[in-house]
Regions:
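Covalent nucleotidyltransferase
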Residues: 130-132
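Conserved donor-binding loop and adjoining core beta-sheet/short helix segment
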Residues: 27-128
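Short amphipathic alpha-helix that is part of the acyltransferase structural core
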Residues: 1-27
Length: 133
């Protein structure tokens, strides 16, 4: 189970990830996005997350740039993101169409890529099979 609690973007925890900082929230705010910050409470992981709300063609999109910083166990990525998305959806405006994550976590394909000597990721249609709908 994951719960999120809203807070000010100036209260984001210090991090080496530029895209999850109060500075980035300010930059994106000046570019017309609406930044929001949330503390994450979960048995799997902890931390906080910056969410950027963008208006696009009459719809609102939620973007999570390079976050959340702290991943769950590798086998729990999908379930964790589903639970986090549901928790965030309860705190976002109802007209947000979807949440997009640009995860800073180790790829689920990293070990296999190294062992097999792959030069690139599997083709998109195969990677997307892991997508949560």
């Amino acid at each position: 189970m994951v719960d999120v609690i809203a807070k000010g973007t100036n209260e984001l925890h210090p991090t080496d990830i530029l895209f999850q900082t109060p500075y980035w929230a300010q930059v994106k705010s000046q570019m017309g996005m609406a930044p929001m910050a949330f503390d994450i409470h979960s048995s799997e992981t902890w931390g906080d997350v910056l969410v950027l709300i963008k208006n696009h063609c009459g719809h609102k999109l939620a973007l999570v740039p390079q976050g959340p910083e702290h991943p769950p166990a590798e086998g729990m990525y999908g379930q964790y993101l589903e639970d986090l998305s549901l928790a965030l959806a309860d705190r976002l405006e109802p007209d947000v169409a979807f949440i997009r994550y640009d995860l800073p976590w180790k790829s689920l394909y990293a070990d296999e890529m190294q062992q097999q000597g792959w030069g690139s990721f599997p083709e998109a249609r195969l990677r997307e099979m892991r997508m949560n709908m």
